[in-house]
């Protein structure tokens, strides 16, 4: 039991944490569930280049976007910039190229090395099906 726990801690702490070069330009807090790692979330968003050119808009499509945080379904800037938000919240974030589409860009829509600005509204948050242990819970497990 202790070996499994130590191995999990090893995995958690051995992966480098990317410095969050995300700029939060506007933040309207929500009041619902908080986004944590592996939360399934549903959002509406607008994506723009730094010059104001809109490249994507889920409101215009009238279809929210659903994905799971922490599973690399979206760019890293979204992973970092949305964690901690709450259901009902709205946030405008500026994402540097290295946390967006980088040197390659994304087709004809997003040029290489582009800063991206996203206006995101959190519509729904579903927490993962496992319990997050607190430090005291971990100590109790270690004592057994």
Outline where the language-model segments fall:
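Cross-family detector of peptidyl-prolyl cis-trans isomerase
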Residues: 2-9, 14-144
